[in-house]
Regions:
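N-terminal intrinsically disordered/low-complexity leader segments
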Residues: 1-10, 187-204
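Short amphipathic alpha-helix in the helical subdomain of ABC transporter nucleotide-binding domains
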Residues: 8, 83, 87, 146-150
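Helix-turn-helix
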Residues: 14, 22-56, 60
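Hydrophobic alpha-helical connector segments
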Residues: 60, 74-106
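Short, basic, alpha-helical segments at the C-terminal edge of helix-turn-helix-like DNA-binding modules
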Residues: 63-69
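Amphipathic alpha-helical segments used for helix-helix packing
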Residues: 86-89, 100-130
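Short alpha-helical scaffolding segments that buttress acidic/His motifs in well-ordered protein cores
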Residues: 90, 94, 109-113, 150-157
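Hydrophobic/aromatic-rich alpha-helical bundle segments in the mid-to-C-terminal region
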Residues: 120-134, 140-193, 204
């Protein structure tokens, strides 16, 4: 039976939405085209009527995932009024056990990181990912920096917390990183002191 144009567009939307979730949850190589299409009640043949390759779907799914992230960040701004408060609330969410335990609906910066690190060559997917990281960093930026240190810290922490899920270390990673990112700005004790200053004024 011939599928209408409207139904074809809906099938494509569902495939991209499912891929966006499953790729973040299982990794690009952790889900086959057949299993992806089965999850939305469609056939593999239907996939190739919509996409030239799995790589094309990965690029579209990554773009859709970062679009969802943009909407999430905008909602934090709307809900919390001023950007500093919104940024703090985002850190609270990002370093939560809820975010750790639900990668399929979580941040694509972390969700696609492993696959992007294994990408052998530059291309549309990597360009999409890099653009998403830059936009996330811009949202996290402050007068003190461009947001990249915060994004790197958040993503690294959530990846490690997921990798150690079920252990005490996982919880500690989330808590310690949250404490570090929300501490008042300023030099940490001992970091910028000279050896003599640490030993006290009577040091010789």
């Amino acid at each position: 039976m011939r599928v209408s144009q409207a139904q074809a567009l809906e099938n494509r939307r569902r495939a991209v939405a499912a891929a966006s979730r499953l790729f973040r949850e299982r990794g690009v190589n952790g889900i086959s085209v057949a299993d992806l299409m089965k999850s939305i009640g469609l056939t593999t043949g239907g996939f190739y009527k919509q996409f030239p390759s799995k790589e094309a779907l990965v690029a579209e799914a990554a773009q859709a995932s970062f679009g969802d992230l943009d909407l999430l960040l905008a909602s934090f701004d709307t809900t919390h009024g001023d950007h500093d408060t919104a940024r703090s609330a985002l850190v609270d969410f990002y370093l939560s056990t809820e975010h750790r335990d639900q990668p399929g609906t979580g941040c694509p910066t972390a969700g696609f990181a492993g696959d992007m690190a294994r990408e052998p060559t530059a291309g549309e997917v990597r360009d999409t990912y890099a653009a998403g990281v830059r936009e996330f960093a811009a949202w996290m930026s402050t007068d003190a920096d461009d947001g990249l240190p915060s994004v790197a810290t958040l993503v690294g922490a959530i990846l490690l917390a997921r990798a150690t899920a079920g252990t005490e270390l996982s919880e500690k990673l989330l808590e310690s990183t949250h404490k570090a990112l929300t501490a008042p700005h300023g030099p940490r004790p001992g970091i910028l002191e000279t050896g003599a200053e640490r030993q006290g004024p009577d040091a010789t």
